[in-house]
Design a protein with these regions (language model features):
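A conserved short beta-strand
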Residues: 126, 149-166
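Serine-hydrolase catalytic machinery in alpha/beta-hydrolase-like enzymes
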Residues: 1-123
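Post-His helix in hydrolase/transferase enzymes
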Residues: 229-243
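Catalytic histidine neighborhood in serine/cysteine hydrolases
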Residues: 211-228
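Gly/Ala-rich beta-loop-alpha elbow adjacent to hydrolase catalytic centers
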Residues: 128-137
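Short beta-strand/loop motif that positions the catalytic acidic residue
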Residues: 185-186, 191-194
Length: 254
């Protein structure tokens, strides 16, 4: 299976290859999976005070704000003071309600960028996203489902891996998809790699809650907003991914 890999905000191809190297080595050891790494189409500067956290330049994003002003801010700035409400959906609404700049224009261009890349570098069997990359991956999956309904185009992706994810945008890019206010569901098998110590855990769970509960699986590496690197944990995760792949192959076999 060939996976398209999307890094988090301020990531790059080279950085994401390093972050994901243990899992890549595990899954490529028996040729279960091959990986195609990309980066966001927008080159950006990291937030002030976070330069060391994201490593050296260059920095890329998939989503950028279009109207930052005195009254609005990038959602990345908002999550520095991440709220914790009763449910993941309540938390995400609180996060996005006040003064967050719009990102629909950049997200629309990013979808065009991804579809062009899929045509040139694909086909791909699965998609893998970390943090902001998971948001865009989920958005792309829902957009593929909408195109199938409206235009009869079959989706390319058959499964997804989400690391430290956030809920997707609607296919029309006018807001987030939250399970307590939308019937939209990501209908391919998904594996959600979360850390129970992640300060943004509610973002992870809000994404999980808009996936098909019959084919969505949570894998907890028990750390923070990071990718698992411990050898035993990576081996266990590799086996989980292989199980998802076998289920997908069984579903799509002749």
């Amino acid at each position: 299976m060939k996976f398209l890999c999307l890094p988090g905000a301020y990531g790059s191809i080279d950085k994401f290859k390093v972050q994901l190297a243990p899992l890549v080595q595990e899954l490529e050891s028996d040729q279960s999976v091959s990986f195609h790494f990309i980066q966001g189409p927008y080159e950006v500067a990291p937030p002030i005070g976070y330069e060391d956290f994201f490593g050296g330049p260059p920095y890329y994003r998939f989503i950028v704000p279009s109207d930052v002003s005195e009254d609005t801010t990038d959602v990345i700035e908002r999550i520095r003071d991440f709220p914790q409400l009763e449910t993941p959906e309540m938390t995400m609404r609180e996060l996005m309600t006040y003064g967050v700049a719009k990102t629909d224009d950049s997200a629309r261009r990013t979808l065009d960028y991804l579809y062009d890349l899929m045509n040139k570098e694909g086909p791909f069997d699965g998609i893998l996203g970390y943090s902001e990359g998971a948001t865009i991956a989920g958005t792309l999956l829902l957009h593929e489902q909408m195109r199938e309904e409206l235009e009869g185009r079959p989706p390319m992706f058959k499964c997804a891996l989400f690391f430290g994810g956030w809920p997707p945008m609607t296919p029309t890019l006018d807001g987030l998809v939250l399970s307590d206010e939308s019937d939209l569901t990501i209908n391919v098998p998904t594996t959600h790699i979360i850390g129970s110590l992640d300060p943004y855990l509610h973002g992870n769970l809000a994404l999980y809650n808009v996936c098909d509960p019959d084919t969505a699986f949570i894998f907890d590496h028990a750390k923070g907003h990071t990718l698992p690197r411990d050898k035993g944990m990576v081996k266990e995760l590799g086996d989980t991914v292989r199980q998802m792949i076998e289920e997908v192959k069984g579903t799509h076999s002749p």
